[in-house]
Amino acid sequence: MDYQAILDRILDTVDRDAYLTPSTQVDPDQRAALEQVGRALQSPDLEPGAARALVERLYEEGRIDRVMRLSALHVVAAHPAVADYALAARLAGEQELAALELGGPNLQANLASADRHRGVIAFLRGHTAIALDYFARALERERTAENLGNVLCALLRLGEVDDAASLLHQIREAYPPRVVAELAARIDQDPDLALLRDQEIDA
């Protein structure tokens, strides 16, 4: 794995058309439904079966599409309380195929989601360089605060603190205030990004 080549891809992506960065392309109705799943996963009394049942109910009610169903089921499978990484990997593959079959204007965002899920599995399994590659792919497809945060997490886990700090500075200079603010909130909340908290971020 050529770290410098991956880093160059990331820096090029951050430089390129930063102010054209879209907001998340999940439509508001689906986003609201997925937030229900997120709240269920944050519960201290998490029951994986109940979380999966919630995902299936939202799908049956037409509140999420097939791609988002597979994405949400992946998130449940990869949750630390479940840690079914074989299932999570299979669901990421199924999500990619579903995204290709669906096509449409959200294709790149849906493929970015599958790349992001693969990166999460690699990250949780200790293959951080591979995770960085997946996160870089996701960022190339969809330049969002979530994908930027994942790249920064992987850089820090690899011990590349200076590169992470430099990238953060570049993001602050190039990206819209909305994205910078979203990333700042994530840095404040995510323990994997704690080393960047002394890097001032102006929204």
Give residue ranges: language-model regions.
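Alpha-helical adaptor scaffolds
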Residues: 72-141, 146, 150-153, 157, ...
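Charged, low-complexity interaction regions
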Residues: 16-25, 45-46, 64, 82
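Amphipathic alpha-helical repeat scaffolds
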Residues: 11, 15, 19, 23, ...
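TPR/TPR-like alpha-solenoid helical repeat scaffolds
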Residues: 106-115, 150-159, 179-199
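Flexible helix-coil transition and linker loops at the boundaries of alpha-helical arrays
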Residues: 40-43, 58-67, 97-108, 177-180
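Alpha-helical linker/edge segments of TPR/alpha-solenoid repeat scaffolds
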Residues: 120, 124-126, 157-167, 191-203
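Conserved positions within tetratricopeptide repeat
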Residues: 52, 68, 89, 132, ...
